[in-house]
Amino acid sequence: MNRTMFKSKIHRATVTHADLHYVGSVTVDLDLLEAADILPGELVAIVDVTNGARLETYTIAGERGSGVIGINGAAAHLMHENDIVILITYAEMTTEEAKAYTPKVVHVDKDNKIVQIGNDPAEGHTRGLMRPPFALNNSALN
């Protein structure tokens, strides 16, 4: 049996532009994609922290070092410039693979520059954010 598991995320990125008339997808700085182990064309879930919207789309590589997080096409009705978003990927794994897998969590600043890369999906590196109550640290699970 395979399980769908959390693979990686880019945490609390800022939308740099939203283009309603582009043909779908999300454009992401190539540095961020590589840091989060996300390929161009890969399926991502995007959660908008600002307004609660959630959607799925695919990635397009943006200019390296640009900090671009561009919401394209119909998704621009839901997510707007300066919204805070989380881009999440999942992967199919066997139970054994899932137990051994270490996810990638890329924390960024307001300019979408990497501030830390970790592997704990519940760890916050943004001022004012805390670990959710009762959430175990990854090391406590081993």
UniProtKB/Swiss-Prot annotation:
Its cofactor is pyruvate. Substrate binds at T57, G73, A74, A75. The active site is at S25 (schiff-base intermediate with substrate), Y58 (proton donor). It catalyses: L-aspartate + H(+) = beta-alanine + CO2. InterPro entries: Asp_de-COase-like_dom_sf, Asp_decarbox. Transmembrane segments: none annotated. Pathway: Cofactor biosynthesis; (R)-pantothenate biosynthesis; beta-alanine from L-aspartate: step 1/1. Keywords: Autocatalytic cleavage, Cytoplasm, Decarboxylase, Lyase, Pantothenate biosynthesis, Pyruvate, Schiff base, Zymogen. Its EC number is 4.1.1.11. One of its GO terms (biological process) is alanine biosynthetic process. It is found in: Cytoplasm. Belongs to the PanD family. This is Aspartate 1-decarboxylase. It comes from Arthrobacter sp. (strain FB24).
